[in-house]
Amino acid sequence: MNKNKPFIVVIVGPTASGKTELSIELAKRINGEIISGDSMQVYKHMNIGTAKVTPEEMDGIPHHLIDILNPDDTFSAYEFKRLAEDLITDITNRGKVPIIAGGTGLYIQSLIYNYELEDETVTPAQLSIVKQKLSALEHLDNQQLHDYLAQFDAVSAENIHPNNRQRVLRAIEYYLKTKKLLSNRKKVQQFTENYDTLLLGIEMSRKTLYSRINKRVDIMLDHGLFREVQQLVEQGYESCQSMQAIGYKELIPVINGQMIYEDAVNDLKQHSRQYAKRQMTWFKNKMSVHWLDKENMSLQMMLDEITTQIK
């Protein structure tokens, strides 16, 4: 361990891999507190679809960066990094171990390494104006929206396919918020870590993972996911960026009478599997992770291996 830097444990892995359970049991062993590294669990009222840890599951372990925003608020890697750094300092100063658990690769990477991320924070009044301008573009088809982006950021338009509507909208939103071009944004990674980091990941065969994902979706639906999405739509959150998350965007067309339920469930499972694949690709290509084989290791075996590395 590097005594000159704060020590943190980071647990990554794809959706449905068991990060929550491992992080809680590890926190019990090493006197830790958990910081969520998930971009969606920050939102209130979005519990089932984000697989948010419940108070019962927490079992007395403090959790941070959960339920801190409303669904119409925005959240970025910049905000996550700023808040997580403050939490790490506070937790460390109280003699406890910060454990960051989550599957949002950019958030984890920005925290561990010296990323320079620009502040996209705007006032509520400015955000309202940005939302109005984005709403005015909703009627445009993908090509028209792409052409609009090209008018002020040709480089981003060149690098983003017209059918990738979400990325096109992201580039437009960035410009409306900052008056800067997304293509010029600086994101510099130094090859030194901010912390003395034990970076762990949970892995398993694709067949096992996909089976766990399909089962989890069924459980979410049994626990009321459809009603959760329905309530968010009724509260006026349908057009919010947070509602583009997997688990929410697939069910909105059912609520609006545009798709049958069974097709939406199939889409939800497929999108979840595709997301898990992207997560694993990110972690394996961009980060140096010590992998724990969930298929061949029990929870206790994983905990024993982790605590051995910490000592």
Swiss-Prot record:
Record: residues binding substrate: 15-20
GO biological process entries: tRNA modification
Taxonomic path: Bacteria, Bacillati, Bacillota, Bacilli, Bacillales
UniProt subunit comment: Monomer.
Residues with site note (Interaction with substrate tRNA): 104
GO molecular function: ATP binding; tRNA dimethylallyltransferase activity
Protein name per the record: tRNA dimethylallyltransferase
Residues engaged in binding ATP: 13-20
Required cofactor names: Mg(2+)
Keyword tRNA processing carried by entry: yes
InterPro entries named in the record: Dimethylallyltransferase (IPR039657), IPT (IPR018022), P-loop_NTPase (IPR027417)
Record-listed E.C. numbers: 2.5.1.75
Function: Catalyzes the transfer of a dimethylallyl group onto the adenine at position 37 in tRNAs that read codons beginning with uridine, leading to the formation of N6-(dimethylallyl)adenosine (i(6)A).
Keyword field: ATP-binding, Magnesium, Nucleotide-binding, Transferase, tRNA processing
Region (Interaction with substrate tRNA): 38-41, 166-170
Transmembrane segments: none
Reactions mediated catalytically: adenosine(37) in tRNA + dimethylallyl diphosphate = N(6)-dimethylallyladenosine(37) in tRNA + diphosphate
The keyword tRNA processing appears for this protein: yes
Domain of life (superkingdom): Bacteria
NCBIfam families given in the database record: miaA (TIGR00174)
Protein family according to the UniProt entry: Belongs to the IPP transferase family.
Enzyme class at the top of the EC tree: transferase
